């Protein structure tokens, strides 16, 4: 593994942990040369899954897009990076376990919302506002009222 700080090719593993899903290994590494420390993640790689967009276009499933959306929704909340990573891993695992070669963006959005609702109400409302393309304040209020009823 190449060091991201100095580019040296020799690093050593300080710590390895498997996440609760058993699908990801987190490794803490240290560069032998500059002593810089960094974290790497190892995940299973399944066959390609394609996402069918609202306009009918298809593109390769991209975990990073889900991660970016969830991170934006969780900004300035008490949700940790580990919780975000786990949520995204769970969504990816659900998509891969389905065995489908294609999935609609709407289905991915539903999976994310289902998991965000359990994790953090504010992040859920933020994500819902983009996913459902809110145009009026009443749409926000409806989602907030729905959350209140469930608690």
Curated annotation (Swiss-Prot):
Cofactor dependence: Zn(2+)
Cysteine disulfide partners in this protein? none
Task: Give positions of the unnamed zinc fingers.
Answer: 3-34
Residues annotated as domain ATP-cone: 49-139
Q: Which UniProt keywords apply?
A: ATP-binding, DNA-binding, Metal-binding, Nucleotide-binding, Repressor, Transcription, Transcription regulation, Zinc, Zinc-finger
Per the record's keyword annotation, is ATP-binding included, yes or no?
A: yes
The question of whether ATP-binding is a record keyword is answered with yes
Organism's domain of life? Bacteria
The cross-references to NCBIfam families, in alphabetical order and at most eight, read: transcriptional regulator NrdR (TIGR00244)
**Family, per the entry?**
Belongs to the NrdR family.
* Purpose: Negatively regulates transcription of bacterial ribonucleotide reductase nrd genes and operons by binding to NrdR-boxes.
Q: What's this protein's name?
A: Transcriptional repressor NrdR
């Amino acid at each position: 593994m190449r060091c991201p700080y100095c580019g040296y090719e020799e690093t050593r593993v300080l710590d390895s942990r498997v996440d609760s899903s058993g699908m990801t290994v987190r490794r803490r590494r240290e560069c032998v040369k500059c002593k810089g420390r960094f974290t790497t993640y190892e995940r299973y790689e399944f066959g390609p899954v394609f996402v069918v967009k609202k306009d009918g276009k298809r593109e390769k499933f991209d975990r990073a897009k889900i991660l970016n959306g969830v991170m934006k929704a969780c900004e300035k909340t008490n949700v940790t990076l580990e919780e975000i990573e786990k949520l995204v891993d769970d969504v990816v695992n659900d998509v891969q376990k389905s065995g489908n070669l294609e999935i609609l963006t709407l289905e991915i959005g539903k999976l994310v919302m289902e998991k965000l609702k359990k994790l953090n109400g504010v992040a859920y409302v933020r994500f819902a506002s983009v996913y459902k393309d809110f145009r009026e304040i009443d749409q926000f209020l409806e989602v907030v009222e729905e959350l209140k009823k469930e608690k």
